[in-house]
A protein has these predicted regions:
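Acidic, low-complexity proline/glycine/alanine-rich linker and hinge segments
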Residues: 1-33
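A short acidic/small-residue loop/turn micro-motif
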Residues: 63-69
Length: 121
C-alpha cells in the first residue's frame, strides 16, 4: 500500500501522523553538526517502506535534493528512527508493507526555533 502526505483515510492518517512526529523528533535530536555548521538547506523526497511489525524494509530517494549530504542525512535519520510502530491491524490485514512517500525539508530557522530543523511534510 502506498500513502503520501495527502492521505486522509483515518487509519492511515493516524499512523502517518505518529510516524511523521517520531521521525521529525528523532531527526531534530540527531541533526548532523556538519549540516548545521554549513547552514545547508534543501528538500529531498524519500519513500520509506515499513513492514507489518514496524521494521524498516527499504528507503528510496524519489527526488534528490541536489546535495548528496542532505540526501544521505535523510536516509540516516530514517534509519535512526526505526523500528517504527507496528502497523495497526486494520492496515496489516490489507498489506504486508506500507510505502510512505514524504518530503524531508532541511531548514535553517535559527531565529525562530533556536536551531536548524528537519520538517517532514
Amino acid at each position: 500500500t502506498f500513502i503520501s502526505a495527502n492521505t486522509r483515510e483515518s487509519i492511515y492518517a493516524v499512523y502517518m501522523a505518529t510516524w511523521r512526529d517520531r521521525v521529525q523528533r528523532i531527526g531534530n535530536l540527531n541533526y548532523p553538526s556538519v549540516v548545521r555548521q554549513q547552514r545547508l538547506i534543501g528538500s529531498v523526497v524519500l519513500e520509506v517502506v515499513v513492514g507489518r511489525s514496524g521494521d524498516l524494509l527499504g528507503i528510496h530517494i524519489v527526488k534528490p535534493s541536489g546535495r548528496k549530504i542532505l540526501d544521505d542525512t535523510a536516509i540516516q535519520l530514517a534509519r535512526l528512527a526505526s523500528p517504527f510502530a507496528p502497523l495497526p491491524a486494520a492496515i496489516g490485514r490489507k498489506t504486508s508493507a506500507l510505502h510512505i512517500t514524504r518530503t524531508w525539508r532541511f531548514t535553517n530557522n535559527a531565529e525562530l526555533f533556536g536551531a536548524p530543523r528537519i520538517r517532514i511534510n
